[in-house]
């Protein structure tokens, strides 16, 4: 065996040795190398040695032949299969050699082998794989695993030990490798699991091309799955700089920018928050680089906020400790970051509330005082998170000492406010120390007003409950807390706050606000314990308590009983008493209430002497209340004390005069007497009062003074008298009063006169109160009738106060002493005497109202009678006669319900409630059924029907009565405001029954209908029930708040609590849709409101079949003529939009067939409708449509794909529609406002690029597929080609660019056609549009066929040569954009672009040559590029030199000049010479001087070529051009000819004499003064060039010419007009003449030079003199 193997090896070795050419050697290696290497596995040592020898020989030959290519596919295949180490080493050596010699052709088989095994042999195959990818196009035939993609992605990182990628990373081709790998990953069908990682790493690449491409791919689809644990772990490893790929056994360094990017991604991942590595990130904060700390702090907050509490809880204490250490160390100075840390503390406590300690609270409150304002916001947020856990705090007694110092030691600090919040939340409401803190805060001298208001929430139970509901963490616990919340016992409060104090000194030593707060809080406690259901204790400032106590006898009794039951009521009464002595309003009113509740034995203890002394000094506003209090107190005293006080008061009255002081005292004394004797009579009787009055004459004098005051013109006297009469007539009979000589009739007549004549409303009101109470003192029907008529005549008085006073008076007349208003004025323990009084005026009063008033056609009387009837039913005790007239009362109230007066309706509804309260048993049930049937049957009783027809008089205006519908229309037309017709007609559109429903509500809302009866009513087995449900639900969303409220009450009362509204949604929606088209705006608006309520929080799929109808009607009402309807419709439209968007977002995440199907259904209904209304005339509709479509597109749902073209069309057109009008205006008037058009164009382009429409368009591009692209193309083509708005065209160009960038393969088939459209439109008159189209063409060149690209670019570039500046600019920009966006195509079309750039950069337009010069500098290699494209450049120049357009011909000449200067013309000298020679024959034209300069440069550059055969021709050309008459051209010609004649190769050209003849004239002063063609600077330049030409044309041996030249110069100097610049030119060119002059000539020449040097301001004059005469130039010149 060994011999055979050796023989084979020898043969192979021989063939290899005999291989003479490199090709034959490579062929043999391809055949024999792999089989030879297999022999390394031979068991025979001799074979192995021979194999090694041959392998070494081959390797030596390969090292000497760098072009040899190895059979890598066979080598790699053998390597991955080899087991023998020796063979592997040799295989590796050959693979290493062959890897660097890979041919530039695809080898997909080798690539697939490498991809299959790269993770097994990364050091061998990874770099080879990347090299192979560079020369291969992505194809689905090549497969790759996720792990391999992960390994390949690491190519963009730096390996810490630099073992794997070092060759490629430092290669000159590294950018190509990086780009090719990116493209493969993006375009191939490889698994997408790790593609994002390659983009992610490459986005931070140091090579901008790579980073830019990676960013494009990332935007397209390259985001990690942030809920994929493997992705998240990689990101966390990157953030921690611990990224490792196990398959490569390598760790990689990651830049800080990438680590920050990784954290930015993690800030969106919930799963990341639940990993141990996330906790490591938190621990890493202090050690992290400063630039990473902000992101890590944000991530910490994210982790704490999003982590599973069960995961985070064991680590919470450590994290809290870490955060506190960071904050205390002050390493983090940023306010924002410190704020994040404080917020994180709050979030941590949500995870583990055991972290909440008083120490932590103290720390946070202290920080709140010391940190900057921006950080305090976050601390406050953290404290707000912590607060709810204190609502069930375990150590309340330990907490209060922590909080109090922050509140009282620094009341102005933010910590004080926060500490107060904890006081409000952490303690039960009945915890007195906490309430006491709130009370102590009520001191305006120490605490700010807002702080006081916050503390008041801790003194009001309902506000406290509402405040605590915000901080609820557990709904059930919160309900228990609210249920258990109660005011503390009033006795406990009094004992806690007042028992240990001298109450008089307490008032004097503390702020009044603090004392008053205590009083108010104790009163709330009393009322709370009396009856919690009434919630009197929570009425702000107890403002309504007096009115309620007047109207509710039971409540008065309950409060009285509660006061008596207080063990320390005396202490509280004394406290209020001393507050009253200080003349504060609140204590005075409170004491008035309390003495009415208190039994006589309690009131007896109050020191009346102190009060009597003070009462005369009370302000007028409190005087009546104070004297009433004193009257009650005195009435409980013994007879002696009463007699003494009354005697002193009588004395004051008798000694009074007209001085103010005495008058007020007398007035006060009258009040004291009146109240005292009244309450004495209330306790006993009127006859017993006589025993307290020692002198009967005094009482007569008292009544006499009262009557005198009543008739006085002084208002105070009158009101005082009325107040006393009002009280007296309640308790004293007519007989008792007349026994003292009082004329009862006279008093009544005075009062009736006042009602008619006095203008003061308050006096009239008091008169009504008095005359109604006069009826209590007699039973005379005739007198009662007189009083009744006096009350009746007040109905026409237009004052609400008088109206309500008349109703009270009417009820008192009817009800007598048992009337609620009468009983409420008497102290509760004195009311027993009132029960003995009787009155029988009830029947005739009720009859009068029902018969003479209710059915009156007078609106004011009906208004008054409705209130009178209500007051009698509500405030008089029911009698037998009430039941007799019950049916009449009922129908009267129903008749009031159909009145158009809201007040009458409300009154009637209250009357129905009052009737309901009067009835019992079957009568109450019958009443309830009747009302319900009235609504359900949609009818009104025949007696109450009030129909409207065309001739019904509805209301009146200042133009008269509006009687008919026709009159309404006329009035609206004449008013000039047609909108009014809707307001007017809405009245006719609402039946009287509708108005009745509003009134019925209050009555029905109080009916306690059983649930069974409700279910029976709404059983929906009849159309009546269904109709009722629809109407009730719609009516309770009426635009009128009162109607809506009352209808809501009806709904709550009539509709079963367990009604399943969802099952009836369809029918309710149909009803609303019907009424949204109603002529009545109220129907339309209520229907809109109903839909908002009905569809809120309902998935759109529940009403998808009705969605289009709903949306259609909502858009219709959005453009309603009534503003309130429009305003109501906007929330409905937003609701529908939000529902569609949310439903579509859910289906975006649900990729199951059912989810996709649901998404398609939603889109198929919503989008066609929205697109149809995208061009609606109503601005609001368009705006809403736009916002909805935008949000739908943002969901990225694939079901939108088929609608994307239409959406894109709308967005493109919206770009123009919603462009700022200012931009359009300025575009038309730019010149008028001296604004550069370029600035306007840039602003408009920027606005388009940054607009929300472009964002939507970009999202749409991501949703396109082949089918939708087919639809989009004609739309896009039309947008580009048709005339339209500038923004739309710019947007269309942007779309084309985005399509190429993001969806290149998709747009490729349409690229050619789009290119044609853009080509036709790119020369738009608007520069911004042209620029955008040119840019789009640049992008399209990437994906269109090369032939089309060449043709298109050629046609656009050809426009340059037409000479139009705008077209030239566009052509230039296209070239730049092609080089920038399609560099490969640009290079392939280099023969087109480079010659054009070279030609165009010589344009005389700055905007053109600037662009193209920069492009030439960046893209070309100067002379090399010129030489490479010399043939194309010459043809281009030659073509444009023969045209007649100077703005094209001149650049051609300039280009030719540069071409001559920079190119190598070894083989093209004759062609250039012929071209120059022919073009020089033309007459002078602007720019020909450049041609002459090019001609001279060519002559100087190639003298041998010229001298051989062209000298004579050159002589003719130079002479001809020298003699041209065009003065401007001649100046340049002198310079060029001078340059040629100065060249040593052309010394034989003798043009000395010609030069003097042509140039001498220009040195004459006569020419200088007369020539008008040139300006001064041009004349000086011409003279300089003349000097230059004459001096350089000088030749030796021509004495005459020398003399002529010196004469010209001397004469010019003699005339002393030469500019110093011309003199400097003479000095500069002097050496030419010095060489050829004789000594005699030189003397004259030296004088000329001296005169040129003398006084020449240029420093160069000295330098030129030194060149001619050496260092001693000055002495030489002077001599």
Curated annotation (Swiss-Prot):
Its main location: cytoplasm. This is Proteasome component ecm29. The gene is ecm29. Component of the proteasome. One of its GO terms (molecular function) is molecular adaptor activity. HEAT repeats lie at residues 27-64, 66-103, 105-142, 314-354, 355-392, 394-431, 513-551, 697-734, 742-780, 840-878, 884-921, 1023-1060, 1089-1127, 1160-1198, 1202-1239, 1267-1305, 1309-1346, 1467-1504, 1509-1546, 1600-1639. GO terms for cellular component: cytoplasm; cytosol; nucleus; proteasome complex. Belongs to the ECM29 family. Gene3D superfamilies: Leucine-rich Repeat Variant. InterPro entries: ARM-like (IPR011989), ARM-type_fold (IPR016024), Ecm29_N (IPR024372), HEAT_ECM29 (IPR055443). The keyword Metal-binding does not apply.
